């Protein structure tokens, strides 16, 4: 009951903050939560956004952003795990396997772009296959490696917002980081600071309400032991003017208002 009350409370906050813009279809997006479990209390990597950016200025966030059209064409070290693909294909609207790959690869790309941290594996052909946003991978002789990703949650920004996202939240262990690009974090960057923060600590209390909900789901998953693909994946979305928390693959209502 306490969990339900918290979700309802956060939904009311979302409605209060809403600008009530005309309907905008949410854009696919991906977020990556990196976890360090080397200590007694797990830590997650958060970045502080520049105070001049449009979306959530000055807030602590997890790296993430919109899916690019080219993400599904990026060469990888191996296909995304079948169990991960199955989770990404659950829910409505139905998507193709190529879109599932795009979501997973977007999470890796955004993490590299915003934090300089690369999840990849060595490949002799990397330099000739990657360019643009993937240049740091090519220079390090890496191809992106999605094998360590797990889907934690899906959340859709409520109607009435000018910026709406259909976000898949992924997590990966810090041990999956194989390369760091220097100079990505600086005073004029999108993220001006990176911090490893213990789950449950005060700095995380200022996260966006929906992000706190997702982090709470991750904390529960971590408490049960190693991450598994067969765990239930929550889906936060609005239906009938109210926020719902369903389970992907088990939702009883279509997301007509998404």
Task: Describe each model-derived feature in a short phrase.
Residues 1-258:
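N-terminal leader/linker segments that precede catalytic domains of diphosphate-processing enzymes
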């Amino acid at each position: 009951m306490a969990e339900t009350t918290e979700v309802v409370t956060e939904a009311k906050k979302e409605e209060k903050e809403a600008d009530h813009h005309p309907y905008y279809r949410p854009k696919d997006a991906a977020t990556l939560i990196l976890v360090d479990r080397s200590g007694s209390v797990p830590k997650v990597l958060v970045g502080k956004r520049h105070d001049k950016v449009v979306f959530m200025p000055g807030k602590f966030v997890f790296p993430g952003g919109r899916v690019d059209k080219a993400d599904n064409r990026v060469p990888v070290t191996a296909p995304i795990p079948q169990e991960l693909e199955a989770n990404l294909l659950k829910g409505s609207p139905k998507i193709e396997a190529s879109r599932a790959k795009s979501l997973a690869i977007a999470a890796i790309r955004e993490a590299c772009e915003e934090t300089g941290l690369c999840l990849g594996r060595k490949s002799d052909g990397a330099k000739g296959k990657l360019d643009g946003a993937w240049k740091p991978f090519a220079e390090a002789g890496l191809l992106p490696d999605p094998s360590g990703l797990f889907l934690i949650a899906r959340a859709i920004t409520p109607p009435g917002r000018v910026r709406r996202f259909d976000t898949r939240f992924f997590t990966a262990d810090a041990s999956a980081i194989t390369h760091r690009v220097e100079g990505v974090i600086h005073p004029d960057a999108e993220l001006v600071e990176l911090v490893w923060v213990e789950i449950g600590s005060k700095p995380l209390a200022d996260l966006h309400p929906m992000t706190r909900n997702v982090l709470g789901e991750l904390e529960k998953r971590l408490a049960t032991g190693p991450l598994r693909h067969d765990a239930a994946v929550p889906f936060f979305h609005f239906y009938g003017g109210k926020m719902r928390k369903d389970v992907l693959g088990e939702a009883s209502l279509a997301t007509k208002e998404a």
